[in-house]
Amino acid sequence: MKEIVLAGGCFWGVEEYMSRIEGIVETKVGYANGIKENPSYEEVCSGVTGHAEACYIKYDESIISLEELLNKFWSIIDPTVLNKQGNDRGTQYRTCIFYLDEKDLNVIIKSKYQEQKNYRKPIVTEVEPLKCFYEAEEYHQKYLKKNPGGYCHIHLD
C-alpha cells in the first residue's frame, strides 16, 4: 500500500471524491504541515497555524497508480489560484501535494509539469514532503457521507 496527502480546498469534498475511486483503501481528513501540534479546526481556520486542510489517502498501487491518482486530483482543483478553492478563502485552503515517499517525487513533478500545459497562469500547488498530519475532529471525518447535503466546492455527481 502507498500513501499520499492531498490538499485541495475544503477537505470534506476532497475526501468524499477520493473515497469513491477504485483502489483507494482509506481516507481521513486532517491538518498538514503547520507549526502547531495537534491544532483544532478553529485554530487552523484562523490562519495562524500554517496548516492546510488535507486528505490522507492510502491506496493500492496495483489498482491505481500515483499518476492516475494525481490526474484525478488535478481535475477537482484550480491549481493556479493561491489560498482559495471554490468559495473558500484562506491559507488553509491552498492546494498541496504532500508526499511520504521520496521515490514519489519524480512522478509528482512530472504530473505537475504535464498539468501546467493546460494553463496559461502558473500552477501554485505546493509539492512538499509531509512534515506532520493531525487528524481532524471526528465530526469532519466522512462528513459528506454523514451529511449528504453538506457544503462541497467539488462537483461530485
Swiss-Prot record:
Give Gene Ontology CC terms: cytoplasm
EC top class named in words: oxidoreductase
* Coiled-coil positions: none
Give the range the annotation lists for the signal sequence.
none
Q: Short name of one Pfam family for this protein?
A: PMSR
Keyword DNA repair belongs to the record: no
Name any Gene Ontology BP term.
cellular response to oxidative stress
HAMAP family the UniProt entry points to: MsrA (MF_01401)
Q: Which residues form the active site?
A: 10
Q: What species does this protein belong to? A: Clostridium botulinum (strain Kyoto / Type A2)
> So which domain of life are we looking at?
Bacteria
Role summary:
Has an important function as a repair enzyme for proteins that have been inactivated by oxidation. Catalyzes the reversible oxidation-reduction of methionine sulfoxide in proteins to methionine.
Q: Which UniProt keywords apply?
A: Oxidoreductase
Name this polypeptide is given: Peptide methionine sulfoxide reductase MsrA
Q: Which reaction does it catalyse?
A: L-methionyl-[protein] + [thioredoxin]-disulfide + H2O = L-methionyl-(S)-S-oxide-[protein] + [thioredoxin]-dithiol; [thioredoxin]-disulfide + L-methionine + H2O = L-methionine (S)-S-oxide + [thioredoxin]-dithiol
Q: Annotated Gene Ontology MF terms?
A: L-methionine-(S)-S-oxide reductase activity; peptide-methionine (S)-S-oxide reductase activity
Instruction: Tell me which EC number(s) this protein carries.
Output: 1.8.4.11
The cross-references to InterPro entries, in alphabetical order and at most eight, read: Met_Sox_Rdtase_MsrA_dom, Met_Sox_Rdtase_MsrA_sf, MsrA_MetSO_reductase
Q: Describe the family membership recorded for this protein in Swiss-Prot or TrEMBL.
A: Belongs to the MsrA Met sulfoxide reductase family.
SUPFAM superfamilies listed in its UniProt record:
Peptide methionine sulfoxide reductase
